[in-house]
Amino acid sequence: PNPDTSTDPAEMLTGGIKTQGKFDFKWGRAEARIKTTQHIGNFPAFWMMPTDNSLGWPNNGEIDIWETIDTEDRAYGTVHTNWTYNLKKGGNSRYMEGLDYDYWHIFAVEWDPTSITWYVDGKKMWSYLKSTKQSELEDGQWPFDAPFYLILNQSVGSGAWAKPADTSFTYET
């Protein structure tokens, strides 16, 4: 909840950290040990955005290492590209169920020139592969040959995916 709406009228304040302008990388492993409070409106994420976003979202890509919403026991891993979002070719997201967010979990991606692979507590969740078809690459199927930076944030829902935030609750990730 926002303790002082006189300086900021938003009902909820959220926050996060990002490495933009301080650290980015092209290929490798990124992981974080995370736990969160499961509650209606919860929408935390650990994700990556391109350092050069000159083509705009989603054309330069986005890698969602981990997201969860509301009271779900799921961990989502997703990519956003022109291919998956604008052209609606699909195949951009998977999830793992059965997570107890009262306990810590390790969420990771391993990213190389031809694939991105998601892990939850060391267990492979899924892989997104670079196409071998030139026409698909030209349509933006794989914008992941450039540096990305990391973001870890605690957001709340607006009703679009996660339900609207409970303004009487303190969300923690």
Regions of interest found by a model, annotated:
Residues 1-173:
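GH16 jelly-roll
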